[in-house]
A protein has these predicted regions:
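Membrane-proximal basic amphipathic "stem/tether" segments
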Residues: 1, 187-214
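Single conserved hydrophobic/aromatic residue that forms the stacking wall/gate
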Residues: 2-13
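Short glycine/serine- and small hydrophobic-enriched flexible loop segments
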Residues: 4, 55-62, 139-143
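Active-site-proximal specificity loops/subdomain of glycosyltransferases
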Residues: 19-51
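Short, solvent-exposed loop/turn segments at secondary-structure junctions
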Residues: 26-29, 69-71, 91-92, 106-108, ...
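GT-A fold catalytic core of metal-dependent nucleotide-sugar glycosyltransferases
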Residues: 45-96, 102
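Conserved catalytic core of nucleotide-sugar-dependent glycosyltransferases
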Residues: 81-135
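Catalytic core and acceptor-binding pocket of nucleotide-sugar-dependent glycosyltransferases
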Residues: 115-187
């Protein structure tokens, strides 16, 4: 099935059997726990989203993508029949729900993630030291047998796919590398970073490309 295909601000296409839902301040309880309340007060929107996506998926089920993800191929039926699935990043080997996180309502891992936020308090210690959702979910899955490596594996009720499937960013050549099994591409717009970090990310990547070409 074709889920959603979007190029920047261009047209968005969707199948009739899928619905795109926007979650915002109007339909989200921003005082549900201390973590989300404090993150919202400090305008750390990405960290607000980290909790909200897990709660919505736990309550309703569905498929979550970051806004800079492009679905390039139909998701096969055997994938969509899984109780839950996500992917890893090639350069970090961390589980990354921003690539995709799909699950049925009542998902065990989504609930465990919600519980971890409910026990936590958001501390604005700087973008480099705040525990990201990737680190949080990877730590959780490692405690339950996950191995951070490039292989398909199922932990609890979530199947984690290698980076070629949902990431497509090749850490070795430092650019997007679409393969036969690639279903979606993460373009890494890094919307949560301040402008000076985006510049460093951009020029750092470009300089590494130059180094490879020499």
């Amino acid at each position: 099935r074709d889920l959603v295909r979007s190029r920047g601000l261009g047209d968005v296409y969707k199948r009739q059997d899928y619905e795109i839902v926007e979650w915002n301040e109007g339909n989200t309880d921003l005082h549900e726990n201390k973590y989300i309340e404090r993150a919202y007060q400090l305008k750390k929107w990405a960290f607000v989203s980290d909790y909200v996506r897990m709660k919505v998926l736990y309550d309703y089920g569905g498929i979550y993508f970051d806004t800079d993800v492009e679905v390039i191929r139909s998701f096969p039926d055997d994938l969509l029949k899984l109780p839950a699935f996500t992917g890893i990043e090639s350069f970090s080997l961390l589980v990354s729900p921003g690539l995709v996180f799909a699950c049925e309502s009542g998902n065990v891992v989504a609930k465990m993630m919600m519980d971890s936020y409910n026990r936590d308090i958001f501390e604005n210690t700087g973008i480099d030291t705040i525990k990201t959702i990737n680190v949080r979910i990877t730590d959780l899955l490692v405690c339950n047998g996950f191995e951070p490596c490039e292989k398909k594996q199922t932990v609890l009720d979530v199947t984690v796919f290698p980076s070629s499937v949902f990431c497509a960013y090749d850490g070795k050549i430092r650019r997007i590398n679409i393969r036969e099994d690639t279903l979606s591409v993460h373009h890494y717009a890094a919307s949560w970073l301040p402008w000076y970090r985006k510049i460093r990310l951009f020029f750092g990547t470009k300089l590494r490309h130059i180094g490879i070409l020499k």
